Amino acid sequence: MIKRGFPAVLDENTEILILGSLPSDESIRKQQYYGNPGNDFWRLVGHAIGENLQDMAYEKKLKTLKHNRIGLWDVFKAGSREGSQDSKIGDEEINDFSGLKEMVPKLRLICFNGRKAGEYEPLLRGMGYETKVLPSSSGANRRFSKNRESEWEAVFRH
């Protein structure tokens, strides 16, 4: 089944861009980035910036990210996948990142949320960006990464 990503959430003041892979089924259903309550994204970022993002309404979450100069997007514009696991993504169509420098002139760091998104780190690094691959915020990754919270937190102290 073909799944489509969401539009980028960024503006001319964005300094840090977090790239996921492709929205989960729950996120697609809700039409929200990281809409699956089992995903720790909002908790991890909220902890790092000193905001209780997980208890905010979605639009307020996005406004808070923008206020903190954080943008969201996905590596993939679309892809086929049964279920929500990144390992099941096939027939990927990547987003067009060629215009980022013009659209987001203050962008200084691109972070990849998890291994699948991180496979495209060399592409963005090759475009001249500082990059970092972070442990996945997926709830399924919780037990595999002891330092996950500190790695996410370090990005925002950068």
Curated annotation (Swiss-Prot):
One GO term of the biological process aspect: DNA repair
GO MF, one annotated term: hypoxanthine DNA N-glycosylase activity
InterPro entries: Hypoxan-DNA_Glyclase, Uracil-DNA_glycosylase-like, Uracil-DNA_glycosylase-like_sf
Class of this enzyme: hydrolase
Protein name: Hypoxanthine DNA glycosylase
Keyword Glycoprotein: no
Domain of life: Archaea
Keyword DNA damage: yes
Recorded family membership: Belongs to the uracil-DNA glycosylase (UDG) superfamily. Type 6 (HDG) family.
